């Protein structure tokens, strides 16, 4: 596991972590990589696909990266034709909608020097580059109202037939709210985590890159949902299919 495992490569202005890799992931870059492998016909196509998945219109630039799942990643990849929503199909009238105001300008303002992933820069040079990034981001972006449909946690825990409708290999977005996270990054988020639904021997698992376990692992789906119950931060899940 490595937070922010991918960047814009050696020509990146702010983040020169590789455009793709297979040794380290965070939750999003794991999904990015697996999805690109599913969609690609060969290595050249993989390189193209991962840029299409990670950046708006495949424009490899920090400010064009799909930083926010509900504001960027999902709508841009839906537009690409790479994903299709299953949430309503699975849950029907049990489906709820989460809304949030993503404050991009504030998010850029809260960025710290560790976002500048260029090994040869001195600490002072990183601070200077961070100032450039904040200025660029704050000029480009304003707040955006976003919404995402989800299946409530309590419905998933009490209704095994509902869980059985989730196809193996589906994308799972964990929808919720976290005031502590908001205070750290400068904006509310209504998608807290992402991974894949995997069926194995009649059991449903979530396959994900875990910051706690520091690796990619399978966690029994119900057990993972229950870990959020004492925190009260998880509302439910949004389910999407990869359109290979």
Predicted regions and their residues:
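Short, flexible coil/linker segments at or flanking structured domains
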Residues: 10, 56, 160-162, 185, ...
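Short amphipathic alpha-helical surface micro-motifs
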Residues: 50-51, 153-157, 178, 218-222
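C-terminal soluble interaction/assembly domains
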Residues: 172-244
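Acidic/His-rich structured neighborhood in mature extracellular/periplasmic domains
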Residues: 2-151, 167, 176-178, 191, ...
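Generic hydrophobic, helix-prone segments enriched in Leu/Val/Ile
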Residues: 50, 73, 156-157, 166, ...
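Short alpha-helix capping/helix-loop boundary micro-motifs
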Residues: 148-163, 182-184
